[in-house]
Regions:
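Conserved donor nucleotide-binding strand/loop of the catalytic core
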Residues: 67-101
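Hydrophobic targeting segments
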Residues: 17-23, 39, 43, 52-57
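Short beta-strand/loop segment that forms part of the nucleotide-sugar
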Residues: 50-61, 83-85
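Acceptor/aglycone-binding surface of glycosyltransferases and processive sugar-polymer synthases
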Residues: 87-101, 118-192, 196, 224-233
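Short aromatic/hydrophobic "clamp" motif used to bind/position activated sugar donors
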Residues: 107
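Short, well-formed alpha-helical segments that are part of the catalytic scaffolds
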Residues: 4-7, 28-45
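A conserved acidic beta->alpha catalytic loop
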Residues: 29, 58-67, 114
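Hydrophobic helical membrane-anchoring modules
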Residues: 1-19, 30-31, 167, 191-243
Length: 243
């Protein structure tokens, strides 16, 4: 009986088991590489026994993603993989390009500026260790209080449509932080949407498999994070792609 099953905990196969973190990047702000270096230190301090590897994907940036910044990053974090796409395709395409370079048992993706607290990232990894195939960030009121009206409406509309049209029980698919094991990674790699709603396609595909364990985890936004507004028409266009 599937309902009575529980995930099988993930056991470290070796010391310093690697976790890949895919970081899509578009027009990053000045100093982005230094922040990544600092976040890497925080993660390794909190995740004893893991080797953290960043996979940074440039999604056709017109500014910010400079040779100097990349060199500074890779000099400090030599294991970092840089995927330098010259054409902007969208976050979904960028994440898939990054995942293609990942060979770790556990992995996750989030925005390059790490909008959520490191403790929230560690919580995602905790549930992957517990055996869940996909772990989804569930945003709380602190997140929505920092959204523009347009983006807030789009987020609530997305959750409503996820439930009504797609039958998803995990409706907060747009959190921008998700973890997965190899099984979950295969669902992500099979998505096709290039932009806003690739997260929804990912969770929808994973939810169709009754043997896949999905877990929602409450996450906290960093207080200093400023969330950008959404361009007009993006949500509607991506909804058409999904449907």
């Amino acid at each position: 009986d599937y309902a009575s099953r529980t995930p099988t905990p993930f056991l470290h196969k070796k010391d310093n088991e690697r976790i890949d973190i895919v970081l899509p990047c578009y027009n990053p702000y000045e100093g982005w590489e230094q922040q990544l270096i600092e976040k890497h230190k925080e993660l390794e301090a909190m995740l004893d026994g893991y080797d953290i590897r960043f996979i940074v994907v440039n999604d056709g940036s017109k500014r910010g993603f400079t040779e100097e910044a990349v060199l500074r990053l890779t000099n400090n974090l030599p294991s970092t993989i840089i995927v330098d796409n010259k054409t902007n395709q969208g976050k979904g395409a960028a994440v898939r390009d990054g995942i293609a370079y990942s060979d770790s048992e556990l992995a996750l993706y989030t925005d390059y500026d790490f909008p959520y607290k490191i403790e929230s990232v560690c919580q995602v990894i905790k549930y992957l260790e517990a055996g869940y195939d996909v772990v989804v960030a569930n945003r709380n009121h602190t997140y929505y209080s920092q959204l523009s009206t347009r983006r807030k409406l789009a987020s609530h509309a997305s959750r409503f449509l996820n439930f009504m049209l797609l039958g998803l029980t995990h409706t907060d698919t747009q959190g921008g932080l998700k973890g997965f094991n190899r099984k979950g990674k295969a669902f992500l790699a099979s998505t096709r949407i290039k932009q806003f709603l690739f997260d929804t396609e990912f969770i929808y595909k994973a939810s169709l498999d009754d043997t896949t364990f999905i877990k929602e985890v409450p996450v906290d936004l960093r207080s200093e994070v400023m969330l950008p507004d959404m361009k007009k028409g993006v949500f509607v266009n991506e909804l058409k792609n999904l449907l």
